[in-house]
Swiss-Prot record:
One of its GO terms (molecular function) is fructose-bisphosphate aldolase activity. This is Fructose-bisphosphate aldolase class 1. It is an enzyme of class 4 (lyase). Gene3D superfamilies: Aldolase class I (3.20.20.70). Its EC number is 4.1.2.13. The gene is fda. Keywords: Glycolysis, Lyase, Schiff base.
């Protein structure tokens, strides 16, 4: 583990850029960027277009390590190059800590939650992540209803996989998303917090994790988790809120920082000039940084 990167993730001012839309969500991400499905004829062309978009983001002067602590990549992005370097090396040289999305998507809903599908090639994927100088990983589950058994299952699965990731020298981001439209969202979050605390308390002192959570209904609910000795940082997802709304809610949570995907890229378009693109990205970065650092 890179100690300098760990220090930056633990104490740095800023947020994490989530650039990890995978195969399933790529056509949608490209469409929002202004690239329609008739502009590519196969998966390779599609992934090249999305890599071009991400390259444009990470090489922009607005993608500044003074504001952006880390970036989460999709497996395809990790294996491609930016300006002649593997993406993670390009980011690290720029001062941005690279993470890799490792999950294979969500299973069918059961007990009000969606567990992660089995990650069958996890070991070899983590070995490749180490070769590519990745610092940490991210994996997402989804909680839709107040169901204690379901929430428990989500957290247990996350910690089980997290321990395999830690054993390979990487820092896992555990992401049990709570659907922002869930009927009992505030109650779900209390149960989730208790389960996460149990999982954290069962870790050895040297087993470090990060958490990526939905912004809680009750401000500062996750403060105790953020201060847990095994937690490097707690980050939040935008979860379907607009950037403005997500930023507003984030400002009410003292120890949390953003890890936004859609809310970061929502104003970026393929047809923008360099100046327009850099300004749109810069405005987004500025506002998300502000919500992550300057609290109410």
């Amino acid at each position: 583990m890179n100690k300098e990167q760990l220090e930056k993730m633990k104490n740095g001012k800023g947020f994490i850029a989530a650039l990890d839309q995978s195969g399933g969500s790529t056509p949608k991400a490209l469409k929002e960027y202004g690239v329609n499905e008739d502009q590519y004829s196969n998966e390779d062309e599609m992934f090249q277009l999305v890599h071009d978009m991400r390259t444009r983001v990470v090489t922009s002067p607005s993608f500044s390590p003074d504001k952006i602590l880390g970036a989460i990549l999709f497996e395809q992005t990790m294996d491609r190059e930016v300006e002649g370097k593997y993406t993670a090396d390009y980011l690290a040289d720029k001062g941005v800590v690279p993470f890799l999305k490792v999950d294979k998507g969500l299973a069918e809903e059961q007990n009000g939650v969606q567990l992660m599908k089995p990650i069958d090639n996890l070991d070899s994927l983590l070995d490749r992540a180490n070769e590519r100088h990745i610092f940490g990983t991210k994996m997402r589950s989804n909680i839709l209803e107040l169901n204690e058994q379901g929430i428990k299952d989500v957290v247990e699965q996350q910690f089980e996989v997290a321990k395999q990731i830690i054993a390979k020298g990487l820092v896992p981001i555990i992401e049990p998303e709570v659907n922002i439209n869930a009927k009992d969202k505030a109650e779900i979050e209390k149960v989730l917090k208790a389960e996460l605390k149990k999982g954290l308390d069962n870790l050895n002192a040297d087993q470090l994790v990060m958490l990526k959570l939905t912004i809680p209904t009750e401000p500062n609910l996750y403060k105790e988790l953020a201060e847990h000795p095994n937690v490097v940082r707690v980050v939040v997802l935008s979860g379907g809120y607009s950037r403005e709304k997500a930023n507003e809610l984030l400002k009410d949570n003292a120890e949390l920082i953003a890890s936004f995907s859609r809310a970061l890229a929502s104003d970026l378009r393929a047809g923008q000039s360099k100046e327009e693109f850099d300004k749109a990205l810069g405005d987004a970065v500025e506002s998300i940084y502000d919500a992550s650092v300057n609290k109410n």
